[in-house]
Amino acid sequence: MAKTVLVINSGSSSIKYQLVDLESGEGLASGLVEKIGEPVDGHYKHEYNGEKHELEEPIHDHEQGLKRVLGFFDEFGPKLADAGIVAVGHRVVQGGSIFPKPALVTNKTINQVKDLAVLAPLHNGPEAKGAEVMRSLLPDVPQIFVFDSSFFFQLPKVASTYALNKEIADQYHIRRYGAHGTSHEYISSVVPDVVGKPAEGLKQIVLHIGNGASQAVDHAVFLQCDDGGNAGGVFQHKVFVKRLQAPHVRHAHGQALGLKQTG
């Protein structure tokens, strides 16, 4: 029996999934769930063996959606009992300063991913929920979190640090984190073969272009900055992370950030 990994990407109102052959890396089956929790019929799509199966019905939450996904495997193939699933991988946008590499899904790591939703409010919550649901549906299969931000974990301080009060930055874990790291890691790993040059010493500028887009030089997204004047580069999400009220924002932006005027 082939060994496979079921990859889950849980969004705020959607789920994408793919069953991947562990040895060849080939996608065997895939699909998506859309419009979760919306006041209209949701949409399911499951593809296997060249055939596409679709269904529309209300989808109240991620648990309902994932239960239906597992039902599609048994109804349209490959059957779960024959699929050889040895692990379930969950893509997570933000691992913060906690996760430098993939981590086993446990009660502790689920709670940590939820806590990091302050840095990725649209992503981490649904991703943690997807892992919780899949643990309950496939309790005997190991579940793994894979973090987009891990690819950028070792950024040098000069690339990851803001011109921001250090106390505020440390308290609220504000730094440049990077996004789409799994995509950047894959692209940068195959480029040497494509161009016929050794990976060591090969300089790359990597672009991820999808529903979101980013570039990895050091990188250019996720707690990244818009150009400002008085305070230098300031990224608007830092305001939401700190939940500052307007007077505090004005003080921070005008007096506490960036280079200070002297003399």
Q: Where would I find each of the regions flagged by the language model?
A:
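Short beta-strand-loop/turn "lid" adjacent to the catalytic site in phosphate-handling enzymes
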Residues: 73-123, 144, 151-159
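Short glycine-rich, Thr/Ser-proximal phosphate-binding strand/loop in the N-terminal lobe
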Residues: 5, 14-60
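Short glycine-aspartate micro-motif
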Residues: 5-7, 85-89, 144, 204-208
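Residue-level signal for inorganic ion chemistry
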Residues: 9, 33, 88, 148, ...
